[in-house]
Amino acid sequence: MHFGTYMGAYWIFKFILFPLGFTIPFLSFLYLSLTLGVPFLGYHYAKTYRNKVCGGVISFAHACLFTLFMYMFASLLVAVAHYIYFQFIDHGFVLNEYSKLVDEASKILQRTDEEKEFIRNVIDTARTLTPVDFTMQFLSWDVIVGSLLAIPTGLFVMRRGNRAETPNITPQP
């Protein structure tokens, strides 16, 4: 999957910005902007596939499947990056930063003790997850969101051929 590789590389680059965004706020903004750009990039790749590979004609089902497989392949590639990061690089950095953010937000926002305790329990539960757990969670999330994005992308990309140009093929008995 040619375009899935490009999308996966884009997601890996985007993921590199995620932990860096905790220390450099602009990178967090850039990460969010690139995340919002994923559907548009998926549309661009599907449109390029339609025009260059399919001769400008593609059905809804074909466009939907192409987009779905593109997102699935990208999800597999970025899952490798997620695993490498959480297994060998992170060492609890992301969860510690989230914990600091929660502490700062609790000081600013007036939270009840139950809300604070709930958030603490969520972070403590997340600390028990292994790198494989994080990777599988992100992988399943990426596949689900990719499946949902494939439907509108398929609708926007589909283009029916001109009936005058399509040959009338009848099945032979």
Task: Cite the ranges covered by each PLM segment.
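Transmembrane alpha-helical insertion/packing segments
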Residues: 1-50
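Alpha-helical transmembrane segments of multipass membrane proteins
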Residues: 2, 6-10, 14, 38, ...
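Membrane-helix interface/capping segments
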Residues: 44-62
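Alpha-helical transmembrane-segment detector that highlights a single hydrophobic TM helix
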Residues: 59-72
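Functional transmembrane-helix hotspots
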Residues: 80-109
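Short membrane-interface loop/juxtamembrane segments of multi-pass integral membrane proteins
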Residues: 102-130
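Individual transmembrane alpha-helix segments
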Residues: 124-147
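Short, charged juxtamembrane terminal tails flanking transmembrane helices
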Residues: 161-173
